[in-house]
Amino acid sequence: MPRKGPAPKHTVVVDPVYGSPLVTALVNKVLLSGKKSVAERIVYGALEGAKNKTGNDPVVTLKRALDNVKPTLEVRSRRVGGATYQVPVEVRAGRSTTLALRWIVGYSRARREKTMTERLMNELIDASNGLGASVKRREDTHKMAESNKAFAHYRW
């Protein structure tokens, strides 16, 4: 066990274009092989495209998409007496945001549009409207937690 206490939390730098820490977090999730300028171009292009397509503020669209994708419950494996149970637990706020961003970017990469900018834009628009694969992932996660509610007393 470390004796120095908990590690200090990292402060997220505010995005220079939109002034939102969520945009910075999205850029960092899109980032591959340290190419931050490429990731910024993809994210800014997707947000501009979402603004042109929906007519709404892109940061509002991003927040609405995240709210529709953030899970409130998830299952964690817990081993009790030789059997492994899927125990439903509540998700902390920071983890739910991280999971939502991870799912949005992951399902954007799996889409069939030509460029990553288009894929991310369409996934954000779909998620903000309550559609898309990332929203389905959240529903599946909640369904799994609901079906394993009988093991909730194993929570730690």
Swiss-Prot record:
Keyword Nucleotidyltransferase attributed = no
The question of whether Ribonucleoprotein is a record keyword is answered with yes
Name the domain of life: Bacteria
Q: Which InterPro entries does this chain map to?
A: Ribosomal_uS7, Ribosomal_uS7_bac/org-type, Ribosomal_uS7_CS, Ribosomal_uS7_dom, Ribosomal_uS7_dom_sf
Keyword terms of this UniProt record: Ribonucleoprotein, Ribosomal protein, RNA-binding, rRNA-binding, tRNA-binding
* Any one GO cellular component localisation term in the record: small ribosomal subunit
Name its GO BP terms in alphabetical order: translation
Recorded GO molecular functions are: rRNA binding; structural constituent of ribosome; tRNA binding
Which Pfam families does the record match to this protein? Ribosomal_S7
Q: Which NCBIfam families match?
A: rpsG_bact (TIGR01029)
> What does the annotation say about its assembly with partners?
Part of the 30S ribosomal subunit. Contacts proteins S9 and S11.
Which family does the UniProt entry place this protein in?
Belongs to the universal ribosomal protein uS7 family.
Q: What functional role does this protein have?
A: One of the primary rRNA binding proteins, it binds directly to 16S rRNA where it nucleates assembly of the head domain of the 30S subunit. Is located at the subunit interface close to the decoding center, probably blocks exit of the E-site tRNA.
By what name is this protein known?
Answer: Small ribosomal subunit protein uS7
Identify the taxonomic lineage of the organism of origin. Answer: Bacteria, Bacillati, Actinomycetota, Actinomycetes, Frankiales
Q: Which gene encodes it?
A: rpsG
